[in-house]
């Protein structure tokens, strides 16, 4: 059985309970999401989660990691500039001072630099998509869907106004 633990962040205002206490007890860290699979160690880093998903996927399902090593290197590189330290999502987090921003290294200087870094990643991905389109592909890497496409489609929601039909407002 695989499951992802994604508790609410922060402290419950009514009870004073740390909402991530159980996550820390299980994993010795508080990053989200965290994946659990059977009795194996928890996975909380995107690259480990992707490897686990590939490992436990059914044999006849498409893979998200290319078999071709050059394409694999491209795919992991693009994923890293979106998901990794000092990448798009990282810099989105440190644009504002707050608990999440401070967890990822917020400072006045980092906050000022962050929008430029986000713009660089978006420009890189735009250029890549244009190059791929010229070769007849609508994907970031090669001619099939990869993890880079999935991660970019998901994380691009943090830089666009997402319509409520795609992401309904929550309480």
What is each model feature region?
Residues 1-4, 167-171:
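Short, intrinsically disordered, charge-balanced linker/junction segments flanking boundaries
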Residues 1-109:
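GST-like domain detector, emphasizing the conserved glutathione-binding G-site
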Residues 77, 81-170:
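GST-like fold's C-terminal all-alpha helical module
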């Amino acid at each position: 059985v695989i499951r992802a633990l994604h508790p609410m962040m922060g402290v419950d205002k009514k009870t004073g309970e740390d909402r991530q206490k159980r996550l820390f007890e299980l994993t010795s860290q508080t990053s989200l999401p965290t994946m659990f699979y059977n009795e194996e160690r928890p996975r909380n880093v995107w690259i480990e989660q992707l490897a686990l998903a590939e490992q436990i996927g059914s044999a006849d399902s498409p893979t998200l990691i290319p078999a071709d090593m050059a394409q694999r290197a491209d795919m992991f590189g693009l994923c890293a500039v979106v998901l990794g330290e000092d990448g798009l999502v990282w810099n989105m987090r440190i644009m504002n001072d707050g608990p999440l921003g401070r967890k990822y290294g917020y400072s006045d200087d980092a906050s000022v630099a962050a929008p430029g870094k986000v713009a660089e990643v978006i420009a890189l991905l735009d250029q890549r998509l244009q190059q791929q389109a010229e070769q007849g592909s609508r994907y970031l890497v090669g001619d099939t869907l990869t993890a880079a496409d999935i991660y970019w489609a998901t994380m691009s929601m943090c830089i666009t106004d997402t319509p409520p039909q795609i992401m309904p407002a929550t309480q």
